[in-house]
């Protein structure tokens, strides 16, 4: 039995370029999607990331949220014949403002899965205010409810299975506790890689401000070293057939290169390239 990640679109946000691409077009504003991933075909439906709480909360980072009625997570799930209560597991690549904002819509018998180091890091103040209080307080409440949260210790244990065909591993990038979610598909391994990659065109394909052969460009929003970020991207390009970031369309990878771009289902219809993102006045 093969699994298929689907993309429920959870909205858009306007991001200052420096955050997404280190040193590139500083001060310009770029509109980016905020995706979640619904994994179907396994023993239980699994959701990866829940988007941001509402448009207003994005203003705390000076960003504009663009979340409409059709983007609401319950409406996106309904497109697949599912209710909030049908989701058995929510896996979080990390807990930033645009990734864990809807957990409180789900019942406590939906288990939220995250790397323990990410929970620790979220309350350290190091990347405040990217971890908003309402989102983190809800996760604290889940700690005291039976089976409502599952902590992984990926830096120590290595990969941990969630359901057959789906497992998590430490990302080693973006935040200190970020994790990747790996899915077995009929055409190879798909890796939901959070914010390790923001933009394939700038970071991988076009090598913006990068001179060395096979050298990826890191984002401008990370807690660790640039070498660590580069190594984490190289690991993704070396090990997986499909890469699914949260803020760009999925890509098919061969020989560490992007050979195609996919739409809302992986595996699925593919185009060779995608145009660069649109820019807006700051």
Annotate each predicted stretch with a short phrase.
Residues 1-56, 60-63, 235-239, 261, ...:
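Zn-dependent metallo-beta-lactamase
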Residues 2, 50-52, 95, 118, ...:
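Active-site metal-binding loops of divalent metal-dependent hydrolases
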Residues 36-40, 46, 55, 154-186:
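Core dinuclear metal-dependent hydrolase active-site scaffold
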Residues 39, 49, 87, 94, ...:
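Divalent metal-coordination and catalytic microenvironments
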Residues 44-46, 89, 111, 188-192, ...:
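Structural motif
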Residues 56, 68-82, 86, 116-170, 176-254, ...:
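Metallo-beta-lactamase
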Residues 63-114:
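Active-site metal-binding motif and surrounding structural segment of the metallo-beta-lactamase
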